[in-house]
Each structure stands twice: as structure tokens, then as C-alpha cells.
Amino acid sequence: MRPQDVIEWWRMSRASVIEILAKSSPGKKLTWWKNEIDCRTFAVTKLAETWAHSLDVYDAMKKDYEDTVRVEHVALYGWLNAEQASKVNKTKYQDLRVELIGPEYKAWQFGDEQSENSIKGNASDWCRVVTGRVPKGHKLTLSTEGDFAKKFVKFNHVKI
């Protein structure tokens, strides 16, 4: 396939996704990869997927990738997808609180403050965990509280 054909295919696919999302309410269910997913989660997942593939490209070029505040969408994806990740890893889901510091020292929190399970730390590490993009040998800066949170960080997260 010629490069211009790939770009045209991508533009048409993107337009199709935008059209579907524009006509849908946030809670409407869509079928995606054999699963039911609401429109909001689908949109956030597509953003996370694009970010994750950008990491792959930078990795192939042996260049460092610097996250921006826009990585917040990937962080949200990780939290929204926690229950599904639990199913894939055959672990009973428990409420999870996530507290992150992102680029430009932005603070992001997801989940119930009263949760017995929490993960805190650097947003870049969290995002790489939930997209299956932790480089070999990388020491995570995430701290966990609760058995489920400890397991969650070690899950085999689906590489999107």
C-alpha cells in the first residue's frame, strides 16, 4: 500500500469514528473488540491507543517521548478500564482510587477517596502500565495501598 493510501484510509476511518461519536450520547453502548463499551470510554480508549502507538514509533526511532498534559486522557482510560483489566486477569474487581501527578505538576484523581485500594504516583508511569508500555528494566514510581492495587500494577495489561 502506498503511503498516501494509508493516510487516506486513516482519514476516512477517523471521520467515520467522529461521525458515530457525534451522533451518540456518552452512555450509549457500542460493540468494540467483542465487548460492549460506552461512547465516553470508547473515545478515551481511542485517544489512549493513539498515544500508545506514538510511544511505539518513538521507541522504534530510539527517541525519548516527553508527555504533555494531554496524557490525562490516557490516565482516565486506565481508570475507566480497571474493571475490564481485572476480568482479563481473572481477578475480582475492587474499587480503585488513582492519584497522579502529571506534566506541569497537574494533579489528577479518579475514583472514590474512601477506597481501600489506591495507586499514587507519576502519571507517565501509570499510563505506561495501563497501556502495556512499561520499558524492560524500568522501575515504576507508583505506590500502592491494598491487595487489589498491588495486583493491578502487576496485571498483564492489554497492549492497545
Kindly give the residue locations of the regions a language model identified.
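Short, helix-capping/interhelical loops that line the mouth of catalytic, cofactor-
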Residues: 1-18, 22-23, 64, 69-71
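Amphipathic alpha-helix face/heptad-repeat signature
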Residues: 6-9, 13, 42-46, 74, ...
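Acidic-glycine-rich active-site phosphate/pyrophosphate-binding loop
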Residues: 22-30, 101
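Short helix-capping/linker segments at secondary-structure and domain boundaries
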Residues: 59-65, 88-90, 131-140
